[in-house]
């Protein structure tokens, strides 16, 4: 049974059982700083299980793409070497949110495996939590599983929790028995680490809430979370013991083999590298599709590590030219129908992989040469020095796990203590991963409130002032009954017109006025999605829970923010029209002062393109069409062509913002009523923020007018300095720059002539030290280039001498040292130049016979030169 058919059969089976198909979420978890990547099928439903989000269905089924590379779950180093380790995989899962429980889910799982897929019951082995008599009874007495094929296991294997506190419960796992010809015992036995029994499905029963003391309280509405790896199930149904022998990987392995000219199965090393490429092209392609690009930190660094590991294995297969991007097309052919977003992003993925591989290959050979030299004489079991590991990472871009991969092949170990020490000495640690649970702890009070309070009613689309009731107050991270004058705190209302920061739009500011108090709102946030929190300060009086307040948004700021937000939609559409449909929004910020828009594009936007973008956006503004908003089913909105932002999570119904025929996007932000309200659009800057990601900053309305007037003032001032009319400024500036270049050339010639004259006269001033001519001199008004010219002249006159020249120009010191080749065993030019530079706060280096340095503090130069003279005498004496 092919993987595509397995995936479809799973989804269809659970639809028949009343489940709603939920499309796969991106690999980037939304609003969850605790996770680097989506690593399980339940991640998109985490807020539902926590009670922070409601869905219009209580039963769900999905085929969720997942990543395990970086962070707590990291399978990268084992990928290619084992039968079942992957960076990217698909998790089939069915979920119940307070609907069915153990009896139903166990029955669903058993019938799907044995009836729909036809697996022999005698090939399945069951585990339950050692204290879960209910699940054991269902398996044995209702399903009819032989007690001899059921194991009771401890908390480590069969009790699941979301964290130290919160929802948790026992789980039951289903294993497949591959047969006695494969070593290994059943789960729970001393031989369980063998490969005979392979877990294929985990059924998690969320029935408890664990508090900080460890006490378990039964949940009023228990839920179910299940997960089954498609790759493992495909191996079972296709009669193979290795996931890489399934149809999920075989076409990719065949494509990699064709590109490299190798044959899969010819030898172990070749097979490992081909499996690495097949796995890594899946991970890299979906990461880029989901908005991640190679970078030096966070998720982008994980992607970079995976790409570079793939390139290294490609090189092992003899691929000496850029190749990795050629595997995208075979992947799209296999998975594009199940994940159409991959098909849409194919060209962008190919470009990103090609750029990154080209960049890495520039240093790959040099890095490998350094490593080969370092390990050439190491015996098996020896350690690669930490200094080498660090230098490979810092200078040649070798992720540490890539070096570890090579160490594994050579039967070497890694000196990680030495690596850490080298990194500390350099004070330039490699990028750290995202994460940490501290952010979650700081929001615990929000979490508790979200569990108790209803959804905040937001009225801000239709009004900027409304009445609301104070339902919670927070000060210093704790719930309080009141806030007094001078207190900084947080106010939560049952209804509010204040927009909470989301979708790139800044939160509203304004004030809350009760009969007895005035609270100035400086920001509005939505930390738990549906809970609006107003941050600010009590200006007067005392604000208490239960008080009624008039919530008034700062309308001037709101209008400016709305103008910037609507302009962002116009900018997005203009970019796609002018640069191409590959442009995708990668981030944005809109507030009253400006807009910032990040988007995918492989190269800087030219000045001509920026002018055209600005012209197109302003033309749309002048057309003054209305900005229409509608609530539609998500499928209908997408059918109409509304752009969805990748990575955003949408419900069954979405808000569509349409601006004539120019732009239509899914958006929950506030907008102008008509495009003419934007006024004018002015681009301030265009820059790069990461590989393949560009940023445009712009302003609208009154802020744009101020920017235009500032530019005009600068133009007038510059014209005044050059004593010309503004219209003639460019011509006069070109003339002035040309004259400046001529003067600089003349000055360089004067300096060279002076250096020649200085060199000619200085040779006679050399001091004899033990038969060696030594010349150490300070020269005023000479820069580094002039010093080099002087040194060249002097070395021709004193070929067996020691020379140090110091040039002083505009409070900067340039230093150069030359040592005759026959003297470098006694005097090293690099050490010599540093004896002068270091007392001046500088540093230099170079070859034994020639070195340079730069420094400041010319007042201390004479003393430093005298010290250098004594140092040379000590070396030659």
From Swiss-Prot:
In the record, what terms sit under GO molecular function? alanine-tRNA ligase activity; aminoacyl-tRNA deacylase activity; ATP binding; tRNA binding; zinc ion binding
- The keyword Cell membrane is annotated on this UniProt entry: no
Which cofactors does this gene product need? Answer: Zn(2+)
Q: Which gene encodes it?
A: alaS
Domain of life from the UniProt record = Bacteria
What lineage is this protein's organism placed in?
Bacteria, Pseudomonadati, Pseudomonadota, Acidithiobacillia, Acidithiobacillales
Q: What is this protein called?
A: Alanine--tRNA ligase
- Domain remarks in the Swiss-Prot or TrEMBL record: Consists of three domains; the N-terminal catalytic domain, the editing domain and the C-terminal C-Ala domain. The editing domain removes incorrectly charged amino acids, while the C-Ala domain, along with tRNA(Ala), serves as a bridge to cooperatively bring together the editing and aminoacylation centers thus stimulating deacylation of misacylated tRNAs.
Its principal location?
Answer: cytoplasm
Organism of provenance: Acidithiobacillus ferridurans
Annotated function: Catalyzes the attachment of alanine to tRNA(Ala) in a two-step reaction: alanine is first activated by ATP to form Ala-AMP and then transferred to the acceptor end of tRNA(Ala). Also edits incorrectly charged Ser-tRNA(Ala) and Gly-tRNA(Ala) via its editing domain.
**Which note does the record give on the cofactor?**
Binds 1 zinc ion per subunit.
Tell me a GO cellular component.
Answer: cytosol
Pfam families cross-referenced by the UniProt entry? DHHA1, tRNA-synt_2c, tRNA_SAD
The record ties this protein, via Gene3D superfamilies, to: 2.40.30.130, 3.10.310.40, 3.30.54.20, 6.10.250.550, Bira Bifunctional Protein, Domain 2 (3.30.930.10), Threonyl-trna Synthetase, Chain A, domain 2 (3.30.980.10)
Q: Which GO terms describe its biological process?
A: alanyl-tRNA aminoacylation; negative regulation of DNA-templated transcription
Residue intervals passing through the bilayer: none
UniProt family annotation: Belongs to the class-II aminoacyl-tRNA synthetase family.
> What is the catalytic activity of this protein?
tRNA(Ala) + L-alanine + ATP = L-alanyl-tRNA(Ala) + AMP + diphosphate
Keyword tags: Aminoacyl-tRNA synthetase, ATP-binding, Cytoplasm, Ligase, Metal-binding, Nucleotide-binding, Protein biosynthesis, RNA-binding, tRNA-binding, Zinc
Q: Where does Zn(2+) bind?
A: 565, 569, 667, 671
The record's listing under SUPFAM superfamilies reads:
Class II aaRS and biotin synthetases, Putative anticodon-binding domain of alanyl-tRNA synthetase (AlaRS), ThrRS/AlaRS common domain, Translation proteins
Q: Where in the cell is it found?
A: Cytoplasm
Stated EC number for the protein is 6.1.1.7
């Amino acid at each position: 049974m092919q993987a595509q058919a397995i995936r479809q059969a799973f989804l269809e089976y659970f639809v028949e059982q009343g489940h709603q198909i939920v499309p796969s979420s991106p690999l980037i978890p939304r609003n969850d700083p605790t996770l680097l990547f989506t690593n399980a099928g339940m991640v998109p439903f985490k807020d539902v299980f926590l009670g922070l989000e409601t869905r219009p269905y209580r039963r769900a089924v999905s085929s969720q793409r997942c990543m395990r590379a970086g962070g707590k779950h990291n399978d990268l180093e084992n990928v290619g070497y084992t039968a079942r380790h992957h960076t990217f995989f698909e998790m089939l899962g069915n979920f119940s949110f307070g609907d069915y429980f153990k009896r139903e889910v166990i029955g669903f799982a058993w019938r799907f495996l044995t009836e729909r897929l036809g697996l022999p019951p005698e090939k399945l082995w069951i585990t339950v939590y050692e204290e879960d008599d209910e699940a054991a009874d269902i398996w044995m007495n209702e399903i009819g599983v032989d007690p001899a094929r059921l194991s009771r296991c401890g908390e480590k294997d069969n009790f699941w929790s979301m964290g130290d506190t919160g929802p948790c419960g026992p789980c039951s796992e289903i294993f497949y028995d591959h047969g006695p010809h494969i070593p290994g015992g059943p789960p729970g036995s001393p031989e369980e680490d063998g490969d005979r029994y392979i877990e294929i499905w985990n059924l998690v029963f969320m029935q408890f809430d664990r508090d900080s003391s460890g006490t378990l309280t039964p949940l009023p509405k228990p839920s179910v979370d299940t997960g089954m790896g498609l790759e493992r199930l495909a191996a079972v149904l296709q009669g193979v013991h290795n996931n890489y022998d399934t149809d999920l990987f075989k076409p990719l392995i065949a494509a990699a083999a064709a590109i490299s000219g190798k044959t899969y199965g010819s030898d172990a090393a070749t097979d490992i590298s081909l499996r690495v490429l097949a796995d890594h092209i899946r991970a890299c392609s979906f990461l880029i599709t989901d908005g991640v690009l190679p970078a030096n930190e966070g998720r982008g660094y994980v992607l970079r590590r995976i790409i570079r590991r793939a390139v290294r294995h490609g090189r092992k297969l003899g691929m000496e030219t850029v190749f990795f991007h050629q595997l995208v097309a075979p992947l799209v052919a296999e998975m594009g129908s199940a994940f159409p977003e991959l098909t849409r992003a194919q060209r962008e993925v190919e470009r990103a992989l090609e750029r990154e591989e080209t960049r890495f290959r520039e240093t790959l050979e040099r890095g490998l040469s350094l490593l080969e030299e370092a390990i050439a004489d190491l015996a098996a079991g020896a350690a690669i020095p930490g200094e080498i590991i660090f230098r490979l990472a810092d200078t040649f871009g070798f992720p540490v796990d890539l070096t570890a991969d090579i160490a594994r092949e050579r039967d070497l170990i890694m000196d990680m203590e030495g690596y850490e020490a080298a990194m500390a000495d350099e004070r330039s640690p490699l990028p750290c991963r995202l994460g940490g649970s501290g952010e979650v702890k700081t929001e615990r009070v929000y979490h508790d409130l979200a569990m108790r309070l209803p959804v905040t009613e937001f009225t801000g689309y239709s009004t900027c002032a409304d009445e609301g009731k104070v339902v919670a107050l927070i000060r210093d991270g704790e719930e309080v009954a009141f806030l007094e004058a001078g207190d900084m705190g947080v106010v939560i209302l049952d209804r509010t017109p204040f927009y909470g920061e989301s979708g790139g739009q800044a939160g509203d500011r304004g004030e809350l006025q009760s009969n007895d108090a005035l609270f100035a709102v400086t920001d509005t946030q939505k930390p738990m999605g549906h809970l609006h929190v107003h941050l600010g300060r009590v200006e007067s009086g005392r604000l208490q829970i239960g008080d009624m307040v008039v919530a008034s948004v700062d309308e001037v700021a709101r209008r400016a923010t709305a103008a910037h937000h609507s302009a962002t939609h116009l900018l997005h559409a203009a970019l796609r029209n002018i640069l191409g449909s590959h442009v995708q929004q990668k981030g944005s910020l809109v507030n009253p002062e400006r807009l910032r828009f990040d988007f995918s594009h492989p190269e800087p936007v030219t000045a001509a393109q920026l002018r055209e973008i600005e012209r197109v956006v302003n033309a749309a503004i002048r057309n003054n069409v209305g900005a229409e908003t509608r609530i539609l089913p998500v499928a209908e909105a997408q059918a109409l062509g509304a752009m969805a932002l990748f990575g955003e999570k949408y419900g069954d119904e979405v808000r569509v913002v349409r601006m004539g025929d120019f732009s239509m996007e899914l958006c929950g932000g506030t907008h102008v009523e008509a495009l003419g309200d934007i006024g004018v659009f002015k681009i301030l800057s265009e820059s790069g923020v990461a590989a393949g990601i560009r940023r445009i900053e712009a302003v609208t309305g009154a802020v744009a007018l101020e920017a235009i007037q500032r530019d005009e003032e600068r133009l007038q001032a510059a014209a005044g300095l050059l004593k010309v009319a503004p219209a003639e400024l460019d011509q006069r500036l070109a003339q002035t720059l040309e004259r400046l270049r001529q003067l600089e050339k003349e000055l360089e010639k004067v300096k060279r002539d002076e250096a020649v004259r200085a060199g000619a006269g200085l040779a006679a001033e050399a001091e004899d030290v033990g038969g060696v001519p030594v010349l150490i001199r300070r020269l005023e008004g000479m820069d580094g280039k002039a010093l080099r010219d002087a040194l060249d002249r002097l070395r021709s006159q004193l070929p067996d001498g020691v020379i140090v020249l110091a040039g002083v120009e505009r409070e900067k010191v340039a230093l150069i040292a030359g040592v005759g080749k026959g003297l470098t065993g006694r005097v090293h030019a690099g050490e010599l130049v540093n004896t002068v530079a270091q007392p001046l706060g500088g540093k230099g280096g170079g070859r034994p016979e020639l070195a340079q340095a730069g420094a400041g503090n010319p007042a201390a130069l004479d003393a430093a030169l005298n010290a250098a003279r004594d140092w040379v005498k000590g070396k030659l004496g």
